[in-house]
UniProtKB/Swiss-Prot annotation:
Residues engaged in binding [4Fe-4S] cluster: C12, C103, C198
Protein's name in the database: 4-hydroxy-3-methylbut-2-enyl diphosphate reductase
Source domain of life: Bacteria
Organism: Geobacillus kaustophilus (strain HTA426)
EC class: oxidoreductase
Cofactor notes: Binds 1 [4Fe-4S] cluster per subunit.
Gene from which this protein is expressed: ispH
One example of a Gene Ontology biological process annotation: isopentenyl diphosphate biosynthetic process, methylerythritol 4-phosphate pathway
Binding site for (2E)-4-hydroxy-3-methylbut-2-enyl diphosphate: H43, H81, H131, T170, S226, N228, S271
Record-annotated active site: E133 (proton donor)
Family: Belongs to the IspH family.
One Pfam family from the record: LYTB
EC number(s) on file: 1.17.7.4
Record's catalysed reaction(s): isopentenyl diphosphate + 2 oxidized [2Fe-2S]-[ferredoxin] + H2O = (2E)-4-hydroxy-3-methylbut-2-enyl diphosphate + 2 reduced [2Fe-2S]-[ferredoxin] + 2 H(+); dimethylallyl diphosphate + 2 oxidized [2Fe-2S]-[ferredoxin] + H2O = (2E)-4-hydroxy-3-methylbut-2-enyl diphosphate + 2 reduced [2Fe-2S]-[ferredoxin] + 2 H(+)
Pathway noted in the entry: Isoprenoid biosynthesis; dimethylallyl diphosphate biosynthesis; dimethylallyl diphosphate from (2E)-4-hydroxy-3-methylbutenyl diphosphate: step 1/1; Isoprenoid biosynthesis; isopentenyl diphosphate biosynthesis via DXP pathway; isopentenyl diphosphate from 1-deoxy-D-xylulose 5-phosphate: step 6/6
Length: 316
């Protein structure tokens, strides 16, 4: 079996930055304890488990404001997905120390939205309902920011404003965003369009669209809650025309998916730890459909290998 290692794949700079920020917090004795992460720092359970080993508590719930109410003292880290101004204000009121690990691309979209709102615009925001990134963006002004996920959602919009802007969650499928933006333009011809797919997402999607074409099946290594991982599987099927399966790690691979394949493509979401992806690639490279001894799928990556290394200050 040939394994096509799709490039680029895996970690993006926003994810690495967020994890480094959180690791540095864990190593800083001056920060008040406990240290909490408001939601999953990035959407990957291996990462949150690794942070738990370092004494950082991940709290999850329906929305960021609700999670925040569970915290009475200590330090709170905002995740890479960003938070609304209301969450920041409430954390301040509660006297918590806050650390912002928001991805710079998400911050850029927030700034754009704030500027357009100040100029009197209504905002149409294309995003995944229930995902924390749209929650943070829409939370800037829920009255004037309209969340849409599908073309049907656009049909249901009723905005009476000459000033309208459309933008999007940074990890959406660029093809879905283009289709939805076209529908918005059809309904509101005067709309101002700002496509905000981050470059890392765009490059990874384009790599799958092109490189997965030759494969019989694509394996996407990523957490079930990772929107960008799920979109990579979607791109493989809808754009490259190759059946795709998303797995959290090597243990989730079904032999039936790969036993008849001559070529298997592998990619990984932007929040997937590199050692987890390597384990999948190593398994596929040694797999022989005629030799059951090669079928064993076992995760052996230790938690201490999951997080990126950080430089610690040497004592003088």
């Amino acid at each position: 079996m040939e394994v096509i290692k799709i490039t680029p794949r895996g970690y993006c700079y926003g994810v690495v930055d967020a994890m480094v920020i959180a690791r540095n917090a864990a190593l800083d004795p001056s920060l008040p304890r406990p240290i909490y992460i408001l939601g999953m720092i990035v959407h990957n359970k291996h990462v949150t488990d690794a942070f738990a080993e370092e004494g950082i508590i991940t709290l999850d719930g329906e929305n960021r404001l609700e999670i925040l109410e569970k915290i009475d003292q200590g330090t709170v880290i905002f995740t890479a997905h960003g938070v609304s101004p209301e969450v920041k204000k409430r954390a301040l009121e509660k006297g918590l120390v806050t650390i912002d690990a928001t991805c710079p691309d998400v911050t850029k979209t927030h700034r754009l939205i704030e500027q357009k709102l100040a100029d009197g615009y209504d905002i149409i925001y294309i995003g995944k309902k229930g995902h924390p990134e749209p929650e943070g963006a829409v939370g800037i002004n829920p009255e004037r920011i309209h969340l849409v996920e599908t073309i049907d959602d656009v049909e249901r919009l009723s905005i009476h404003n000459e000033r309208i802007m459309v933008t999007n969650q940074t990890t959406m499928s660029q093809w879905d965003v283009a289709d939805i933006m076209a529908k918005v333009k059809e309904k509101y011809p005067h709309v101002e369009m700002h496509k905000e797919i981050c470059l890392a997402t765009q490059l990874r999607q384009e790599a799958v669209a092109e490189q997965a074409k030759e494969a019989d099946v694509t394996i996407v290594v990523g957490d079930p809650r990772s929107n960008n991982s799920n979109r990579l599987a979607q791109v493989s099927e809808e754009i490259a025309g190759t059946k795709a399966y998303r797995v959290a790690d090597v243990t989730e691979i079904d032999i039936n998916w790969i036993k008849d394949a001559k070529k298997v493509a592998v990619t990984a979401g932007a929040s997937t730890p590199t050692p987890i992806t390597k384990e999948v690639i190593d398994f596929l490279e040694q797999f022989d459909p005629n030799d059951p001894s090669t079928w064993k799928r076992e995760r052996k990556v230790p938690l201490q290998k999951i997080l990126p290394k950080v430089k610690t200050k040497k004592e003088e």
